[in-house]
Amino acid sequence: MNKCLNSKSWRDLEKHGLAVSKPVYAAQLAIYQAYLQLHEHPALFTAINADNMAIYAEWVPFDGALAQRLSDRALNIISATEAGELLPRGFTEATHVECRFCSWQDRCWGVGA
């Protein structure tokens, strides 16, 4: 898996490692390893520093518990959606900064629904 990061994000990755610095990327990698049956060996995560083109590399062992948690979460979301349930939102108002820039804002908040 390869990502491109700015210098600030890059320094944090170097200092703390993938699991702590970029938990979303670590989760994505765990799911890939699980569903592509690549769990027996560590995955190679690489990142390029967009500002100076330096390369970061880290061997990431398979985190089965993380992959299972995420898979269970996805199943819950899919099941709820198919049942027509509205899941709790991460924020209480549609004007929250993350909601304003979300591709799913209209669906989540019922705008135009």
Located regions from the model:
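Conserved catalytic cores of phosphodiester-cleaving nucleases, focusing on short active-site segments
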Residues: 1-16, 32
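Metal-dependent nuclease catalytic regions and adjoining charged, substrate-binding loops involved
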Residues: 14-26, 31-113
